[in-house]
Regions:
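A structural signal for small-residue-enriched, beta-sheet-centric alpha/beta enzyme cores
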Residues: 170-173
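Terminal amphipathic alpha-helical/low-complexity segments used for targeting or macromolecular assembly
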Residues: 1-61, 175-204
Length: 204
């Protein structure tokens, strides 16, 4: 346990340039507190102490602003940077060395039971405000841009941006032009469809 705590603090110190010492990280970083509480809650959850697990989880949520369901499976060295508003669902699975920024949601697909939440591979980065919704895999070393809405699988070492998210880069190879002008806008597409329908009715 102490070994894992030590490597967690080291991961924070490595990834957060504002972190000046492990002592500061341990006492003052809500992301660390949320992860420690989740380890306890998850241990209780796996042993079918569901009420106690949810109680620990909710106490952590109120203190840190980070909502991690006790059923979620989280790997080693998870770094939560500016964690306010993060939500991690019950059947979510996170690999090792994942980095999450504020406002991230790892949400469900709407199924009543079973695997409903995403699986993130090792070394995945999810930008601020991004939503990853559904039961699919985000591959190792993938990057999700800020405010993206990911609704399907992301390959390893790929970058996903936009609403809904699309793959713009795999490794060093650019898949599509990365610009904000041409990111699909479903609301605008629907308005255009309605306008076309109105024109058709007017002409008829």
């Amino acid at each position: 346990m102490f070994k894992r705590l030590k490597e967690l603090l080291a991961a924070y110190q490595q990834k957060d340039p504002a972190a000046h010492s492990k002592l500061e990280i341990f006492f003052l970083y809500p992301g660390v507190h949320a992860i420690i509480c989740h380890r306890i809650a998850h241990w209780l959850y796996k042993r079918h102490h569901r009420f106690l697990a949810r109680w620990v989880s909710e106490c952590s949520h109120r203190r840190t602003g980070i909502d991690i369901h006790p059923g979620a499976t989280i790997g080693r060295r998870l770094v939560i940077d500016h964690g306010t508003g993060i939500v991690i669902g019950e059947t979510a699975v996170l690999g090792d060395d994942v980095l999450l920024y504020q406002g991230v949601t790892l949400g469900g697909s709407g199924k009543d039971v079973g695997k409903r939440h995403p699986t993130l591979g090792d070394r995945v980065t999810v930008g601020a405000g991004a939503k990853v919704l559904g039961s699919f895999t985000v591959g190792h070393d993938a990057r999700i841009a800020a405010n993206a809405v990911v609704l399907s699988a992301v390959p390893e070492d790929a970058t996903a941006v936009g609403v809904p998210a699309r793959i713009v880069r795999v490794g060093r190879k650019r898949v599509d032009t990365l610009d904000h002008v041409h990111i699909p806008d479903p609301i605008m597409q629907e308005l255009c469809r309605i306008n076309r329908r109105i024109d058709e009715l007017a002409q008829g």
